[in-house]
Amino acid sequence: MEKKVYLVLENGQFFEGNAFGAEGEITGEIVFATAMTGYLETLTDPSYYGQIVVQTFPLIGNYGVIPADFESANTHVKAYIVREWCQEPSNFRSEGNLDTFLKERNVIGLCNIDTRQLTRIIREYGVMNARIVNSIENLDSIVSELKNYRVTDAVKNTTCHEITISKPEISKNKVVLMDFGAKKHIHKELEKRGCEVITVPAYTTYEQIMELKPDGIMLSNGAGDPADNVSIIEEIKKLLQTKIPIFGICLGHQLVALANGAKTIKLKYGHRGANQPVKDLVTGNVYITSQNHGYAVDHNTLPPSCSMRFVNANDNTCEGIDYQEIPVFTVQFHPEANGGPRDTMFLFDRFITLMGGNK
């Protein structure tokens, strides 16, 4: 018999559901993700660090567990909420089911709740803190404690701890990848284009990076409030003065903007899913993109040397920036998205061109 558990929201509302995966109680920032596929990528994406993720698609786990699709070696979500999970997955690549996977990774799961209603609440009230508990006898006390929770040290807890180097058979460009919680497929797309990729920890200094003599620098995705990363922003300021080509994705995009004096804002409920339309303000083209972020660059604070290149077609928030005086461009969305869409993969080719093409 499935164990009864509860989801308590910071605004005092609660849901009754059933436990699956690991059992226990956990607190996190609750967000929703709208993608119909890619649940394995979601669970292993470091950008979800500290968060309780709600899947809006009603049935999750249909194609089982496929390690080759993981975005990192670890799971980073605090807990995982679905309407229903598939107990008998069907896929020739599958190595297990979702319930067993969550148990092995000690990730608490919650099922059999109205995820549609829960998503509506998050849309109306905005992202908030939540807790999965075994009892709601002390509801007022739980709600009071929730108001004090904050995701902290996200980059510190998701970055690598040592430098690693990977080379394709024919290496044409040397790229330093600053790992703020990098997804595996950023690395893959660079290597596919003939790049030697040197992955370095987030707190690597300007001087240490210069010793590696890179042709280009990639600033990865990551979790948390971008403004918290004060020391990293200072190092990026120095890197921007070198005129070495730089490509930033997601958190990397935000950190470059902050290094240029712009500001970031927290979105009401963020962009998390694989169906976000983005308009290129130069060409007029519209692309469908994969996104996972709760903060955005405030385009009204950009200095004159920057121009907004991409804008979200739903809410007009900043999705990409071109820097006019230096070989730098950044995007808020994920061109490397595994499982798709792959409309903006050409941005990796633009980065290669900035480095001088295939030498």
Cite the ranges covered by each PLM segment:
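RNA-binding accessory domains that recognize and position tRNA/RNA substrates
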Residues: 1-207, 211-212, 226, 338, ...
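Short clusters of small/polar residues that mark proteolytic maturation junctions
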Residues: 19-20, 57, 291, 322, ...
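Proline-centered loop/turn at the N-terminus of a beta-strand
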Residues: 108, 174, 245-247, 263, ...
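Active-site glycine-centered loops adjacent to acidic/histidine catalytic or metal-binding residues
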Residues: 114, 250, 293, 334
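Active-site-proximal beta-strand elements of phosphoester/diester hydrolases
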Residues: 174-179, 289-290, 329-333
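Cysteine-nucleophile active-site neighborhood
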Residues: 216, 220-288, 296, 340-350, ...
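Catalytic beta-strand/loop cores that center a nucleophilic Ser/Cys/Thr
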Residues: 284-326
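A glycine-centered loop/beta-turn motif at secondary-structure junctions
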Residues: 320-357
